[in-house]
Amino acid sequence: MTLNELKDGQKAIIVNLNAHKELKNRLLSFGFIKNKNLKKIHSSLKNATIMVELDTSCVILRSDEAKTIEVNLI
């Protein structure tokens, strides 16, 4: 399952980042690391952007970026 498939309010753990090097480095700098818990807060209309809570931070990703983050529901 990928991050963009989560429903608003669902919690998950990051399993893998399936992104190219530049995007992977960007995601890592935001705190998207393997085995980290996250919560999907909100999706925009038509799922174009996704707001995610990581620890005490909120990050907004494009749908294409969220598709590269593999997660498991908690």
Swiss-Prot record:
<comment type="similarity">
    <text>Belongs to the FeoA family.</text>
</comment>
<keyword id="KW-0813">Transport</keyword>
<keyword id="KW-0406">Ion transport</keyword>
<protein>
    <recommendedName>
        <fullName>Putative Fe(2+) transport protein A</fullName>
    </recommendedName>
</protein>
<keyword id="KW-0410">Iron transport</keyword>
<dbReference type="GO" id="GO:0006826">
    <property type="term" value="P:iron ion transport"/>
</dbReference>
<comment type="function">
    <text>Might be involved in Fe(2+) ion uptake.</text>
</comment>
<dbReference type="InterPro" id="IPR038157">
    <property type="entry name" value="FeoA_core_dom"/>
</dbReference>
<dbReference type="Pfam" id="PF04023">
    <property type="entry name" value="FeoA"/>
</dbReference>
<dbReference type="InterPro" id="IPR008988">
    <property type="entry name" value="Transcriptional_repressor_C"/>
</dbReference>
<dbReference type="GO" id="GO:0046914">
    <property type="term" value="F:transition metal ion binding"/>
</dbReference>
<dbReference type="InterPro" id="IPR007167">
    <property type="entry name" value="Fe-transptr_FeoA-like"/>
</dbReference>
<keyword id="KW-0408">Iron</keyword>
